[in-house]
């Protein structure tokens, strides 16, 4: 009887197929997202970075990042200071809790340097200006009026100058 059970189990064992675990596709973040995550992480750690964000960048075009930034600014205005641990306690009741934790988890090296936040801000500006530049160039192709084309052309030139200044500043640092 033991041998019969043993043989039965072996035959059942051969029928069982290993089910591979579901593939977890890890999405890579683009330069804008990485920069935004770092800026927000810096802001969660010290109000001086909140001030730098407000004066040097002002807003994020992406709603998710803009809402988290506004939440941090609100927290600083209410509490007159910010520390990561206290902000995380506050975030527990925030509707943005998941976004806030996702940002914190994305930071690989949590070193905070003032020069780095400026690099991240410049990345954001450059990307936003490049997107604006594409939009203006597409608009310019559709416009018939010479005066309108000229106005848009000036905006394009101004944006190109701003982008080149940021790229030049970055290449000097490297």
Regions found by a protein language model. Name each.
Residues 1-15:
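Charge-patterned, long linear interaction tracts outside catalytic cores
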Residues 3, 33-41, 62-70, 118, ...:
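Non-catalytic, well-ordered alpha-helical scaffold segments
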Residues 77-174:
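Bacterial replisome coupling helices
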Residues 2, 59-60, 87:
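Phenylalanine-focused residue identity feature
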Residues 11-79, 101:
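Non-catalytic protein-protein interaction segments used by genome-maintenance enzymes to assemble
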């Amino acid at each position: 009887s033991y041998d019969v059970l043993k043989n039965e189990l072996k035959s059942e064992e051969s029928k069982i197929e290993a089910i591979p675990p579901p593939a977890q596709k890890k999405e890579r973040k683009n330069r804008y997202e990485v920069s935004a995550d770092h800026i927000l992480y810096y802001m969660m750690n010290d109000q001086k970075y909140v001030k730098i964000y407000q004066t040097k960048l002002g807003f994020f075009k992406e709603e998710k990042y803009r809402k988290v930034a506004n939440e941090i600014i609100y927290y600083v205005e209410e509490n007159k200071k910010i520390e990561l641990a206290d902000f995380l306690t506050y975030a527990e009741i925030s509707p943005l809790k998941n976004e806030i934790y996702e940002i914190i988890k994305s930071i690989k090296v949590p070193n905070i340097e003032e020069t780095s936040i400026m690099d991240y801000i410049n990345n954001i500006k450059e990307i936003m200006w490049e997107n604006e530049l594409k939009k203006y160039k597409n608009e310019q192709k559709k416009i018939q009026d010479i005066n309108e084309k000229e106005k848009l052309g000036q905006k394009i030139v101004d944006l190109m100058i701003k982008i080149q200044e940021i790229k030049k500043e970055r290449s000097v640092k490297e």
